[in-house]
Amino acid sequence: MVPMDRLLQIVRRFEFLEARLSAGAAPAEIAALSREYAELKPVVAEISAYRTALEDLAEAEAMLSDPEMRALAEDEIPALRARIPGMEQALRLALLPKDAADARPAILEIRPGTGGEEAALFAGDLLRMYQRYAEGQGWRFELLDLAPSELGGIREATARVEGEGAFARLKYESGVHRVQRVPETEAQGRIHTSAATVAVLPEAEEVDLEIPAADIRIDTMRSSGAGGQHVNTTDSAVRITHLPTGIIVTSSEKSQHRNREIAMQVLRARLYDLERQRLADARSADRKAQVGSGDRSERIRTYNFPQGRMTDHRINLTLYALPQIMAGDLSEVISALTAHDQAARLAEMEA
């Protein structure tokens, strides 16, 4: 049973927001009020449907005492009762605390791990996989920085993904992705294992955290392409070092001004993510065990090309649809991860 007083509080809050917006809230308030109103609207719709179902059931049960209506009530009651548990579960999910970062754009960072050039090639495959997934979702995918490897892979890539639910869906991708396949350069046909690391960060705005100028060092250098050759003759590439944490961010586009913007954007996202992780760890000692914890050292997934198999180790999900997955069809695995995370948070909330 979902506590009715909690539901009524939400309805009253929604009605208050509706009245404030209709009355013409102050310009400084409108954005925050509108955001909260939009978040509560689907929850209030669930509450309304649930209350209607309870009222219908109560009316049908009251009809049992009427000899003329008893038969009709006995026919209706089983179906009405059967609806209630599903509606209560939907309400519990709707009442889960929202991650404030879910509505933000995502900063996606991909780097090869163990495995040399094959790891760099796989990192490139992952970048294309996420780009296709983003395009399929109707999101905007912007490549912020790309350092290619000699054979067409990547040494490092940073992208920005913007669209409804971008970070909420992509945040489960943080971690170590392992690949098992026969490299194109392997003459003996032996299967090699290599890995790439993915980090997904919520984009941070300047108002989220202040970075004092004294805390950063900005260096300019020449941009390098595959094999380390210089791709231009001006010192346009930018490296920013955050002195308190030691975080280093680089950007090597052609415009030095744009490189500063990109590097600061990524640095803000990393620092914001550090603070989010610190707060999450303080709230729950079990956070590291949860799906979506963002632990970049965790091996989360294996892509086995000879078997056409992808296994997500966090939820023991195996799908034999690797070509489709690498082509950007991530909906099934991300939906499964979302459901698992919701179930874990529900259990924690109700414990």
Curated annotation (Swiss-Prot):
Paired cysteines (S-S): none
Pfam families on file: PCRF, RF-1
SUPFAM superfamilies: Release factor (SSF75620)
Mod. after translation: Methylated by PrmC. Methylation increases the termination efficiency of RF1.
Gene Ontology, cellular component aspect: cytoplasm
Coiled-coil region list: none
Molecular-function GO term, any one: translation release factor activity, codon specific
Residue positions where N5-methylglutamine is found in the record: Q229
Signal sequence region: none
Keywords attached to this entry: Cytoplasm, Methylation, Protein biosynthesis
Subcellular location(s) of the protein: Cytoplasm
PANTHER family in the record: LD18447P
Family listed: Belongs to the prokaryotic/mitochondrial release factor family.
Role description: Peptide chain release factor 1 directs the termination of translation in response to the peptide chain termination codons UAG and UAA.
Protein name: Peptide chain release factor 1
Organism field: Cereibacter sphaeroides (strain ATCC 17029 / ATH 2.4.9) (Rhodobacter sphaeroides)
Gene: prfA
